[in-house]
Amino acid sequence: MTASTIPRQIAIIGSGNIGTDLMIKVLRLSKTLEVGAMVGIDPDSDGLARANRLGVPTTSDGVDGLIRMPNFEAIDIVLDATSARAHAANYTALRRYRKRMIDLTPAAVGPFVVPAVNMGASLSADNVNMVTCGGQATIPIVAAISQVTPVAYAEIVASIASKSAGPGTRQNIDEFTETTAHAIEQVGGARKGKAIIILNPAEPPLIMRDTVLALIGPSDHDAVKGSIRAMVDAVAEYVPGYRLKQRIEIQPLDGLPVGTLTSEPVTHKVSVFLEVEGAAHYLPAYAGNLDIMTSAALRVAEAMAAQKLSGAVA
């Protein structure tokens, strides 16, 4: 096996729903990554039990346990699937060891990355942030509109099955809205962004649904729709269950109160309705909100590994 074919080792912090799904995705799908460690704090968690059964090295002593693992030096990339508060401590502990970090929490310590929009912009950073599930689903649409015409205001509503929201998601609700709103502006290109999350208690659970509302001025409506459709196709390359739920709507703002959400001159409202069905690698298909996060993080981790490999070869 040559250096160009040896998988790069990663560690996953957080043995909950997101961390476990990410582990299984890497094991099943990736040819360039290898799970060198699954890190948790609950020795009885299902994620650590599954990792043990699959032959993945584990520790239930958190980041301190990871640092003590015999293969720690060989780990190149650490993916953090804990919580916003925990990530700050994890980053502080690991930074001295020069490990690259992919943050799946709303902590937003490092620059935002949405693979279909700005993959190459931040890969050199030692810590990148995957925004939120709602951000990964909707920011590409805002960016697609921004590529054609300025977006004065963009609002997203992410509706996810309550059953798919674990303790970490529920603890991070405030950070979810703040981080997603900032990323709508910084990555999506909107002058003003707003984010809303809904935990839908319906039974049986419904798959993730997302609505994007954008206020724009005069523009080529066909070009806007074409840009959106192309972006949906780009996201679907790494999240196969990502799709338009219904036709794209562009309506004049005459008499619509949403026109008061911005002081800028706007003439039309763009409405985009999406749904995200999960791949059901570990979680049920309705948990598209978690699937889009782990799929996007896998995409970024593989890009980081490829970047490091190309640098080593050069």
Swiss-Prot record:
Keyword field: Aromatic hydrocarbons catabolism, NAD, Oxidoreductase
Q: What class of enzyme is it?
A: oxidoreductase
Report residues binding NAD(+): 15-18, 164-172, 289
Q: Which InterPro entries match?
A: Acetaldehyde_dehydrogenase (IPR003361), Acetylaldehyde_DH_C (IPR015426), NAD(P)-bd_dom_sf (IPR036291), Semialdehyde_DH_NAD-bd (IPR000534)
SMART domains documented for this protein: Semialdhyde_dh
State the Pfam families in the record: AcetDehyd-dimer (PF09290)
User: Which one GO biological process term can you cite for this protein?
Assistant: catabolic process
Molecular function GO labels: acetaldehyde dehydrogenase (acetylating) activity; NAD binding
Chemical reaction(s) catalysed: acetaldehyde + NAD(+) + CoA = acetyl-CoA + NADH + H(+)
Keyword hit for Signal: no
Q: Which SUPFAM superfamilies match?
A: Glyceraldehyde-3-phosphate dehydrogenase-like, C-terminal domain, NAD(P)-binding Rossmann-fold domains
Q: Which NCBIfam families does this chain map to?
A: ac_ald_DH_ac, PRK08300.1
Family label: Belongs to the acetaldehyde dehydrogenase family.
Name of this chain's protein: Acetaldehyde dehydrogenase 2
From which lineage does this chain's organism come?
A: Bacteria, Bacillati, Actinomycetota, Actinomycetes, Propionibacteriales
